């Protein structure tokens, strides 16, 4: 059955109808053609005519004309609109007319490079031109690499290979860099956050090397490189700031082409919200089970379908569900495959070919297939969960109907706040994308890493800038103090014996890693940033790798090794940590009405103090364990909002919370005395000494009752009363803290909402942001929420949050008001029984009262 005939059945199905929150029909659109640009080599139109392309689409002609006129050009049109031809035409024109000219193509994934290789080779074959084209990445056989270095005129690679495998060895590529005429950068919306900040610095290094070989910088005069010979051709999905983003990446003006001339087929987009299985707790049926139910119907009816999952594990799980569902339906001739990172290259190529040829009917993929690899004409795309940005969602939806035919895209929401906001606010999705791609190439941690690489590649001249970074000389002095470079005359030379590119991953801000090793044999099974390791790799933790559970037996923090052993267990572990923020510098701050808001440089101090064992599926707490790890400090940028005293007093007067006295356990007197002695018998907030005849109070940083101590049943008081969780306060400061502490359920609910809604506006992943709730923050003296960039040094997210605060607060109130749960749930203020957030059963009411007071 065709999709055209299947959709009316879907519309009439009462079970599906009850789940649908939006059904949008996007009408078909005819093509808009243009004439071939006059300046284009006439051999190209003839070759394309032989392949059935008589005229270019309007955006292809416009982009070609701009590029041939010498403009760096950016094409921003939808998926499958022919962006490839828009950059291939000028590149082939230049290479046809200059036998020494070369072109570099950068793609974010290996699969995209392989896909474009075939497209270029087919066109060059029709042209009968001598233009060798090759892919050069980690999968390229070593036996072929010398031939590619010496002979390729078009090189297809990825930023990681350019960074570590090409630029440091530029002397072997001298002919290529001498003739470099064009740099193509596809899918630039992917280059955001930490990854994009790294890539911008890799491009700075590329410009230095091209300038060196092309003589763009006077070697004796030390003039700044002009790099006039290379034209940049860029392509992007729709984002809010394409020109700004492109110009930050290449540090040069770009000309924008955004009016799409390609035809589009009719597309139906369905938003589906799984039914509630527990209305009070706000729990919904798994979106994987929903995808299995409706996806199996599509496949059984002959609709070739791609399913997108958020992780490798959920992709494998959904693949199993679909195969089982088809078997229950008695459908045995439908082939469904998986596609994700970790599959061998030849296996991925075979799956792509099977999809193109129709031998494979369905594929379950991670975002590895989100980008423009040619997988043929799919009828439907099913998104199991929001991929993080509207741009990515449209990319995934665009995998169906790529050749202008009728298609379906179905978004099936998960139970989290981000998914629920999208599925309940379809206008937000279908309206203009609010997302900005943000990078910070001058993040000092990232920049210094690439400055080392650049110095290794070529000496710096006195007065030479590294891109638009204005303090290159000062940064080189810092490296000299570390013994990594030295100044001789007017040059700075690399003197270290290290290979700096090998120590820098483009996917993380910090080069410092923890290696994960099997206890038997010492085989490395993975690695992790040092910043994120403590809550996941502490001793006693259950670490999951490729769906397999490992017990962490030993963490050697100094050496950077975690030793693990495979185990079969029915529980997971969750770390218990204490964190606090120190504001190092305030860049902007406003105190108006109910809120003080600000942003600046912060230090986030964190220490993992314990963990709990949580049974899978039921989430029952099975027990606790202690951890002794050093404090970690993340220096980054943060945004904060703090409640005014009158807001706190009004909520306190409303009696929206209660506070029962605690039994602090048998070791409380001893631990209390130790804490007072450690703090010098002074209040840690105001510095006041203990008055005669009266002792100061001792406060639990993480509230005592969240540790689940039950006298006679467990000894969880030991974790709660560890000195790391205690601080000495005078009576006045303690009252202020406790006043804020009783608000903490509302504050935590609001922080959870802001943390989940912010990525929609920032075009980042929730994991790019961290957050803290402080009942009485030292830098504001008030109950405070802090959201911070998790990349060392920050990448610009906090500053944008400061500007977005009004919209975010309104969106948060709307979200919690509309949620149908009783007390709070993952779709609004977070799970009501989770760890430090479980300070009040009715966190939802507290959060809503707090938002109403703020926005009154």
Where are the language model's segments positioned?
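Helicase motor core with emphasis on the C-terminal RecA-like subdomain
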Residues: 4, 8-51, 55-62, 68-163, ...
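Histidine-centered nuclease catalytic patch
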Residues: 687-728, 739
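Short metal-coordination and nucleic-acid-contact micro-motifs, chiefly zinc-binding Cys/His arrays
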Residues: 676-680, 722-726, 821
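Cys/His-coordinated zinc-binding microdomains
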Residues: 687, 734, 829-832
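Short Cys/His-rich Zn2+-coordinating modules
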Residues: 660-671, 706-716, 806-812
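Short helix-coil boundary/hinge micro-motifs
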Residues: 670-682, 689
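The −1 position to Zn-ligating cysteines in a subset of zinc-ribbon hairpins
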Residues: 542, 682, 697, 729, ...
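Extended, highly charged accessory segments
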Residues: 231-234, 413, 455, 462-532, ...
């Amino acid at each position: 059955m065709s999709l055209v005939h299947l959709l009316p059945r879907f519309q009439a199905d009462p079970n599906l109808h009850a789940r649908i929150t939006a059904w949008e029909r996007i009408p078909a659109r005819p093509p808009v053609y243009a004439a071939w640009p006059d300046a284009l080599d006439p051999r190209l139109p003839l070759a394309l005519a032989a392949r059935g392309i008589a005229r270019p689409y309007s955006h292809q002609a416009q982009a070609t004309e701009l590029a041939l006129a010498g403009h760096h050009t950016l094409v921003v049109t939808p998926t499958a609109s022919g962006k490839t031809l828009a950059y291939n035409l000028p590149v082939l024109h230049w290479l046809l007319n200059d036998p020494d000219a070369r072109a570099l193509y950068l793609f974010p994934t290996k699969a995209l490079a392989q896909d474009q290789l075939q497209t270029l080779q087919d066109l060059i074959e029709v042209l009968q031109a001598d233009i060798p084209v090759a892919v050069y990445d980690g999968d390229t056989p070593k036996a072929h690499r010398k031939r590619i270095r010496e002979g390729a005129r078009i090189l297809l690679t990825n930023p990681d290979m350019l960074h570590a495998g090409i630029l440091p060895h530029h002397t072997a590529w001298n002919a290529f860099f001498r003739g470099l005429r064009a740099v193509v950068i596809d899918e630039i919306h992917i280059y955001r956050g930490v990854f994009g900040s790294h890539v911008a610095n890799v491009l700075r290094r590329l410009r230095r090397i091209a300038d060196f070989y092309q003589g763009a910088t006077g070697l004796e005069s030390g003039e700044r490189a002009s790099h006039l010979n290379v034209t940049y051709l860029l392509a992007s999905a729709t984002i809010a700031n394409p020109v700004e983003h492109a110009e930050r990446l290449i540090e040069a003006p770009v000309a924008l082409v955004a009016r799409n001339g390609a035809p589009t087929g009719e597309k139906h987009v369905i938003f589906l919200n799984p039914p509630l299985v527990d209305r009070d707790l706000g729990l919904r049926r798994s979106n994987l089970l929903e995808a299995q139910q409706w996806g199996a119907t599509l496949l059984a009816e002959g609709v070739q379908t791609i399913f997108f999952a958020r992780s490798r594990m959920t992709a494998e799980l959904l693949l199993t569900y679909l195969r089982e569902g088809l078997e229950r339906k008695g459908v045995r001739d439908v082939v469904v495959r998986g596609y994700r990172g970790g599959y061998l290259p030849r296996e991925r190529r075979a799956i792509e070919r099977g999809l193109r040829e129709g031998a494979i009917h369905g594929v379950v993929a991670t975002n590895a297939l989100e980008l423009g690899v040619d997988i043929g004409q799919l009828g439907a795309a099913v998104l199991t969960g929001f991929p993080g940005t509207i741009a990515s969602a449209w990319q995934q939806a665009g995998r169906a109907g790529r050749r202008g035919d009728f298609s379906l895209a179905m978004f099936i929401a998960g139970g989290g706040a981000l998914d629920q906001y999208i599925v309940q606010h379809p206008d937000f999705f279908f309206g203009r994308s609010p997302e900005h791609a943000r990078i910070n190439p001058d993040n000092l941690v990232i920049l210094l890493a690439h400055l080392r690489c650049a110095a290794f590649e070529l000496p710096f001249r006195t007065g030479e800038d590294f891109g638009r970074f204005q303090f290159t000389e000062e940064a080189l002095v810092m490296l000299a103090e570390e013994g990594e470079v030295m100044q001789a005359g007017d040059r700075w030379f690399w003197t270290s014996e290290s290979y700096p590119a090998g120590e820098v991953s483009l996917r993380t801000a910090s080069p410092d890693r923890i290696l994960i090793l099997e206890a038997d044999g010492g085989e490395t099974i993975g690695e992790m940033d040092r910043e994120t390791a403590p809550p996941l790799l502490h001793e006693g933790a259950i670490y999951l790798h490729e769906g397999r559970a490992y017990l962490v037996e030993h963490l050697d923090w100094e050496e950077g090794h975690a030793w693990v052993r495979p185990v079969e267990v029915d529980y997971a572990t969750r770390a218990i940590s204490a964190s606090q923020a120190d504001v190092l510098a305030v860049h902007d701050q406003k105190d108006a009405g109910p809120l003080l808001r600000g942003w600046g440089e912060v230090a986030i101090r964190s220490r993992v103090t314990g963990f709990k064992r949580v049974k899978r599926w039921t989430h029952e707490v099975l027990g606790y364990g202690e951890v002794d790890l050093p404090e970690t400090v993340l220096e980054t940028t943060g945004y904060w909002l703090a409640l005014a005293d009158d807001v706190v007093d009004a909520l306190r007067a409303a009696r929206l919370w209660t506070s029962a006295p605690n039994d602090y356990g048998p070791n409380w007197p001893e631990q209390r005395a130790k804490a007072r002695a450690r703090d010098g018998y002074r209040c840690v907030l105001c510095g006041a000494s203990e008055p005669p005849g009266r002792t100061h109070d001792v406060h639990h940083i993480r509230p005592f009752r969240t540790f689940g101590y039950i006298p006679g049943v467990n000894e969880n008081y030991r974790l709660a009363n560890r000195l790391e969780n205690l601080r000495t306060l005078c009576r006045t400061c303690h009252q202020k803290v406790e006043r804020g502490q009783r608000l903490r359920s509302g504050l935590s609910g609001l922080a959870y909402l802001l943390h989940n809604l912010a990525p929609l506006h920032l075009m980042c992943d929730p994991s790019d942001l961290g957050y803290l709730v402080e009942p009485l923050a030292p830098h504001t003296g008030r109950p405070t929420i802090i959201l911070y960039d998790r990349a060392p040094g920050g990448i610009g997210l906090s500053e944008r949050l400061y500007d977005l605060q009004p919209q975010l607060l309104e969106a948060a109130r709307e979200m919690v008001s509309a949620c149908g749960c009783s007390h709070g749930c993952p779709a609004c203020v977070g799970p009501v029984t989770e760890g430090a957030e479980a300070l009040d059963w009715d966190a939802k009411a507290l959060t809503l009262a707090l938002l109403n007071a703020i926005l009154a």
